[in-house]
């Protein structure tokens, strides 16, 4: 497909965009100590610009020392201007354009713990401070011009300070900045005027806004949203960047939508607003394919399309779409583990990506080796395949030894759960990528100490993965007791009343899978059902369990199993009251976790032979796939 609409030019004031694709502002956490731009941030943006992105919008910047959340870059000193100028110069040299997102967090940065993990109670803003903040937005816009940016964006969504003023659910002021719709909009109108008056007439002005204000006690109506955007357009806003979500309700999930939400879930909501406003629209929301991106432009539903996490997963997404090589795209799977979870986890230095562990490491490049080595990779899961791909690309000779009859076994199983087809597709994609690169694979091959000696590799990477952790429960060998793997592999399909023991990440998905097939499921967990799930995944669990009518038994220890019965002790979380009981069921599925597959013998043999060896992924200890693939990437780069 040529995707003519997607790759048609677009002009906003004096800015000529070569196509309709924008990299929206997304937090990377790469700002150094809140004040410096390093080679990693520059390389990240340059890579997307070289691939053909029409406009990169730099992540939100703090406009004053407080609040200045620990992961954001600042824009309130000459030093910030100098640092950001390095970035814009590099992107311009690469043929791209740069915008910047002007931001004030209000109470929302308190969600993101600082380095000391402390929280503070936010204060009510004085009118004097409101006027200062308006001036700070104006100063930030002026500094953005000095730093060489081609466009500015005002972030007025997602429960940040501007949205807190706009929403009747958050704005409880009784002065000129609260109460009536006009008063609630006053702060934003003043900010828009301050920004417009501090940038050149030919400089485009974007504004991020919510196309729906929802799931709070009081929200902006559709009419209010339309009126607000049209008034901002009169005051100088050129493009409405329409998103969805807030930080005070379940609507948080719409900001960084996980796999539970359909691709393009927000298209019609955005189009509904577009039809009622007087300026062009940029839209976002799990738009991951060239076909979908082209369609929203072709049908007039968007004027510009934000391709965000798809460009995190593959910096060359645009090149591959333009050249008709979409089968080579590393697709985002909506796991949110490397992007969203990393942002809210202060222990993570920067974002990463399950499918693209080289994210934020673009500055390293992929240096070719001048001493090719024969590398034995024991295990063909995601970590092993990523390691092999990196090694092959760098000029080494990796060989994958896989005990089963196919690659990506565990990740394929992850794709069996409801709404996770993308995961299964990625498992298949990785297997095909190994084949495309010409990497030798030996399936149905169990590696022993003797195998290593016979193969005589220069290096060994052990990526044998994990195995089922079977708890010591009397009666666990009863005929009606099955493992998570038996269910996910399709070896069994328990029906009727089914107890699922161990409801962390895998257990909740097994519970939903069986319930979707008609089983009456009871989810049993020693701690709390859903323990270990990411924040957004936990938010989806309750409505999904309600939809599937899955019963939950948290704080429950299983003491024994027998045919058709589960014996348990339950501790009430609030009262600490302990009760014993017997649950009658037709089948029981054990999902109590995984443990590293034994590999000490292989490692010891390598050491005896003097062969450099590294253990990665689940083989080094149970971990999520994002960490495993990053370890595979690092192992491939280290040789």
From Swiss-Prot:
An annotated Gene Ontology molecular function: metal ion binding
Residues annotated as the enzyme's active site: 160 (proton donor)
Sorted UniProt keywords: 4Fe-4S, Bile acid catabolism, FAD, Flavoprotein, FMN, Iron, Iron-sulfur, Lipid degradation, Lipid metabolism, Metal-binding, NAD, Oxidoreductase, Steroid metabolism
Gene Ontology biological process terms, A to Z: bile acid catabolic process; lipid catabolic process
Residues annotated as binding FAD: 337, 383, 402, 410, 420, 447
PANTHER family from the UniProt entry: 2,4-DIENOYL-COA REDUCTASE (PTHR42917), 2,4-DIENOYL-COA REDUCTASE [(2E)-ENOYL-COA-PRODUCING] (PTHR42917:SF2)
Protein name, entry field: 3-oxocholoyl-CoA 4-desaturase
Species, as recorded: Clostridium scindens (strain JCM 10418 / VPI 12708)
